[in-house]
Amino acid sequence: MRKIILASGSPRRKELLELAGVPFEIIVSEVEETIGAYSSPSDIVMSLALQKASAVAENNSDHIVLGADTIVTYESRILGKPSNEAEAKEMLQLLSGKTHEVYTGVAIIAKDKTVTFYERTEVTFWELTEEEIDAYVASKEPLDKAGSYGIQGKGSIFVQHIQGDYYSVVGLPISRLVRELKQFNIDVTHA
């Protein structure tokens, strides 16, 4: 049977696959995440997910490789992972009291087929005080997350409303992924 390989070192994606009962191994993709000239946020995340999966699939062509990428957008501005605490603070100030979009793209590659898709989720933040932002940034949690917050962690207290797939905001739209894996004859719902 073909193995499923997750081309990501994200502990959140690993946890979501485990929770869903998807058997997998991890081989971290070494692809540099650079955003070129794309027409839309959905194109960006699907392209980056495909680049990550393709890099790992080159040496694992007999298996199924999953790649994923997540970005946050606000008013056409792309908010990736912050490069430092000052940038994290700036992003949180920007998102305070507003609705933003989270896009997660997924690529599934096998020898005979490639599937890419994305999910878009709207997230609305409460108005945040400077003290809340400073304390959160000091916790270091936002420093490795797109948009500078983790909805599954301390950042959850900032969320007033969500419209769409919660797990996509965490980093992997697991329900959709499980359905897409059926195209590759993998059905974890009966495992």
UniProtKB/Swiss-Prot annotation:
Gene Ontology BP terms: nucleotide metabolic process
InterPro entries: ITPase-like_fam (IPR029001), Maf-like (IPR003697)
Record-marked site positions (Important for substrate specificity): 12, 70, 152
Cofactors required: a divalent metal cation
UniProt xrefs under Pfam families: Maf (PF02545)
Lineage, broadest ranks: Bacteria, Bacillati, Bacillota, Bacilli, Bacillales
Organism name: Bacillus cereus (strain AH820)
Places the protein is found: Cytoplasm
Catalyses which reaction(s): dTTP + H2O = dTMP + diphosphate + H(+); UTP + H2O = UMP + diphosphate + H(+)
EC number from the UniProt entry: 3.6.1.9
Disulphide bridges: none
List of catalytic residues: 69 (proton acceptor)
Purpose: Nucleoside triphosphate pyrophosphatase that hydrolyzes dTTP and UTP. May have a dual role in cell division arrest and in preventing the incorporation of modified nucleotides into cellular nucleic acids.
Domain of life (superkingdom): Bacteria
Primary location recorded for the protein, binned into one broad class: cytoplasm
Protein name (Swiss-Prot/TrEMBL): dTTP/UTP pyrophosphatase
GO cellular component, as recorded: cytoplasm
Protein family membership: Belongs to the Maf family. YhdE subfamily.
Keyword Mitochondrion annotated: no
UniProtKB keywords: Cytoplasm, Hydrolase, Nucleotide metabolism
Annotated PANTHER family: BIFUNCTIONAL DTTP/UTP PYROPHOSPHATASE/METHYLTRANSFERASE PROTEIN-RELATED, BIFUNCTIONAL DTTP_UTP PYROPHOSPHATASE_METHYLTRANSFERASE PROTEIN-RELATED
Molecular function terms, GO-annotated: dTTP diphosphatase activity; UTP diphosphatase activity
